[in-house]
């Protein structure tokens, strides 16, 4: 029989009493008054912060947006079907944040940065707030490095720089997503991290984009953030900020990033739905009063950082859909005023076979030639002027029956330049190929080629230069200048190829 020693027992009890610490955990708790349509009204939660995450009994997460005198209006990040009136809600004390790491490259995630591609969890090293303040004036420097899209019409006439925000705007089915995805494909080997944010799109469309990226090897440097049309409005509203937070992680490490928001019209509609259900007063087109701030605080996060912050950059390509070409609607005018230029895609051009359907006349880049290499500046200056004169002449020539020879020549040149701007989807061109193509057009070397033959002639010319005159590309890549030597090589290549091409016909 074991002897019980009272002194041992008392010493154990004494030690435990000494180790006892009084712990009081303060939890901010409320009660659900009403729930439905992705919105919950909660009584209590006196100390809750605006934008704080809330946790419901069933594990659903919400965000406190309306702090009223007698209740709190919260939006739910799920369907909330199991939340009942009278169930308790706990304030978490956290503002919405996401994990970030290099492991996100090549993955498809949702607005909470959780993987949805079935490839397992993503290891993360740190967290970033979904809503971070934009870099200040002192932290930035002016945009000066080109962000090549691989599309001649843009790189020559509406150049985009690293750290710029360029709006892509047009009706549905005019190729807006194609311009953005081609730009991402063209960043291969350029050491640029790309983030593609799909907001309220069909799941099939997102799958198609991801497949294109995978086939072309673009997923190695791309993150896709997707919230499809069946996702709760809250998540569609958050998705662009998640994309920006992921890009910021790389930007502050001194890397160059490109973010595509496809598209912000759907985000504004999701925000309008949330605001109206929260009973916030509606404004123009029933959007809430702060819809401008919704987009400005997102797009201001795109920047070219100064040397003290590592020279990183975030370039934003927001996409906005117009109805019947109406650029003066509320959301289009808002985003046009926030961005540094817009690329306008026209349904008429698209239907007449001009693709990409970029309306060069009303598209602008407010950064301009600062975002071009010298070689491109040297050849592209003439292109925009010639196309503008051609558009004007074409309008007049519809009424005139007999045109003089000079006018006929200018119209013929313009038709060939328009052909020169046409490109197949997912076939971006390198800078040296673009320089060669533009030089051929603006200097009249295409005038002897039939209009219908221009595209095949240029495709073959680019292949001919790569195989027979590789030194041309080397000069442009190394010096970034269209030197006399490069010009001589190019003229020789054009002459040789033209002779061979005309003999084939």
From Swiss-Prot:
UniProt source species: Zygnema circumcarinatum (Green alga)
InterPro entries, alphabetized: ATP_synth_asu-like_sf, ATP_synth_asu_C, ATP_synth_asu_C_sf, ATP_synth_F1_a_nt-bd_dom, ATP_synth_F1_asu, ATPase_a/bsu_AS, ATPase_F1/V1/A1_a/bsu_N, ATPase_F1/V1/A1_a/bsu_N_sf
Entries under PANTHER family matching the protein: ATP SYNTHASE SUBUNIT ALPHA, MITOCHONDRIAL
Subunit structure, as described in the record: F-type ATPases have 2 components, CF(1) - the catalytic core - and CF(0) - the membrane proton channel. CF(1) has five subunits: alpha(3), beta(3), gamma(1), delta(1), epsilon(1). CF(0) has four main subunits: a, b, b' and c.
Primary subcellular site in the record, as a coarse category: plastid
Positions that bind ATP: 170-177
Protein name as catalogued: ATP synthase subunit alpha, chloroplastic
Localization: Plastid, Chloroplast thylakoid membrane
GO cellular component: chloroplast thylakoid membrane; proton-transporting ATP synthase complex
Membrane topology: Peripheral membrane protein
E.C. designation(s): 7.1.2.2
Residues passing through the membrane, by range: none
Swiss-Prot/TrEMBL catalytic activity: ATP + H2O + 4 H(+)(in) = ADP + phosphate + 5 H(+)(out)
Keyword Transport: yes
UniProt keyword annotations, A-Z: ATP synthesis, ATP-binding, CF(1), Chloroplast, Hydrogen ion transport, Ion transport, Membrane, Nucleotide-binding, Plastid, Thylakoid, Translocase, Transport
Described function: Produces ATP from ADP in the presence of a proton gradient across the membrane. The alpha chain is a regulatory subunit.
């Amino acid at each position: 029989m074991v002897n019980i020693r009272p002194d041992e027992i008392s010493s154990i009890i004494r030690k435990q009493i000494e180790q006892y610490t009084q712990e009081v955990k303060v939890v901010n708790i409320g009660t659900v008054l009403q729930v439905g349509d992705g919105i919950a009204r909660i009584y209590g939660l006196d100390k809750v912060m605006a934008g704080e995450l809330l946790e419901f009994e069933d594990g659903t997460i919400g965000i406190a947006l309306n702090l009223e005198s007698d209740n709190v209006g919260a939006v739910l990040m799920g369907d909330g079907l199991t939340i009942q009136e009278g169930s308790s809600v706990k304030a978490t004390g956290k503002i919405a944040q996401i994990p970030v790491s290099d492991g996100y490259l090549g993955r498809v995630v949702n607005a909470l940065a959780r993987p949805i591609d079935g490839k397992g969890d993503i290891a993360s090293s740190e967290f970033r707030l979904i809503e971070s303040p934009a870099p200040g004036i002192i932290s930035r420097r002016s945009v000066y490095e080109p962000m090549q899209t691989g599309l001649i019409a843009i790189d020559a006439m509406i150049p985009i720089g690293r750290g710029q925000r360029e709006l892509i705007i047009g009706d549905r089915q005019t190729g807006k997503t194609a311009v953005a995805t081609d730009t991402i494909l063209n960043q291969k080997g350029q050491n640029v991290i790309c983030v593609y944010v799909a907001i309220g799109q069909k799941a099939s469309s997102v799958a198609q984009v991801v497949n294109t990226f995978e086939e072309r090897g673009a997923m190695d440097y791309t993150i896709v953030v997707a919230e499809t049309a069946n996702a709760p409005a809250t998540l569609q509203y958050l998705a662009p900020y998640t994309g920006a937070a992921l890009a910021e992680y790389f930007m502050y490490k001194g890397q160059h990033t490109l973010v595509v928001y496809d598209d912000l019209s759907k985000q504004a509609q999701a925000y309008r739905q949330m605001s109206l259900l929260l009973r916030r007063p509606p404004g123009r087109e029933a959007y809430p009063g702060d819809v401008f701030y919704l987009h400005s605080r997102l797009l201001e996060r795109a920047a070219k950082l100064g040397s003290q912050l590592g020279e990183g950059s975030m370039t934003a390509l927001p996409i906005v859909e117009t109805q019947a070409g109406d650029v003066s609607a509320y959301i289009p005018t808002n985003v046009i005023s926030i961005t540094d230029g817009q690329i306008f895609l026209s349904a008429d051009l698209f239907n007449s076979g001009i693709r990409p359907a970029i309306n060069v006349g009303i598209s602008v880049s407010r950064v301009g030639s600062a975002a071009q290499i010298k070689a491109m500046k040297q050849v592209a200056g003439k292109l925009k002027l010639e196309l503008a004169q051609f558009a004007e002449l074409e309008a007049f020539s519809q009424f005139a029956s007999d045109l003089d020879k000079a006018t006929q020549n200018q119209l013929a040149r313009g038709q060939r330049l328009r052909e020169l701007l046409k490109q197949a989807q997912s076939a971006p061109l390198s800078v040296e190929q673009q320089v060669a193509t533009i030089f051929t057009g603006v200097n009249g070397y295409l005038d002897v080629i039939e209009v219908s033959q221009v595209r095949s002639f240029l495709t073959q010319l680019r292949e001919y230069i790569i195989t027979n005159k590789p030194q041309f590309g080397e000069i442009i890549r190394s010096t970034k200048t269209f030197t006399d030597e490069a010009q001589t090589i190019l003229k020789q290549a054009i002459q040789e190829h033209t002779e061979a091409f005309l003999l084939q016909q």
